[in-house]
Amino acid sequence: MGLEIERKFLLKNSDWEKWINQKTSIKQGYLNSDIERTVRVRTTDKVALITIKGKTENTSRQEFEYEIPFEDAESLLKLCETPLIEKTRFIIKYQGRVWEIDKFEGENEGLLIAEIELAREDEEVVLPSWIGEEVSHDARFYNSALIKNPFKNWK
């Protein structure tokens, strides 16, 4: 069993772009997007994964993630709720920490979210100047919620 502890933030500006170390294209869908549990299928440039996540409590939840054959993932994505989530993930190494910046495309174009994974819920994080409002506890920003209420519909 794994435990995922992460915090999510909006971005204030584009200063983060000068810190990019890596980028990856991601396509993902949800076989189940219930608030109590999600079952996600994800393909990246290199791998395919199936992930089961439990309900979020504060900033943590149980997470089980397994690599699966790419062809299986492509077939499973056809069974997922729509729209699929499409995004580019940028890896930022900043002051000894790894940040993931997701730039959403398609139905969620215009949305940018920064995430940082932690070892403990009470772990202190020094926020870079480009980090804006924290949205860790706002369910609208869960990827599984973005398939039901895409960002383009928020306006």
Predicted segment positions?
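Phosphate-end processing signature that detects enzymes handling 5′-triphosphorylated RNA
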Residues: 1-155
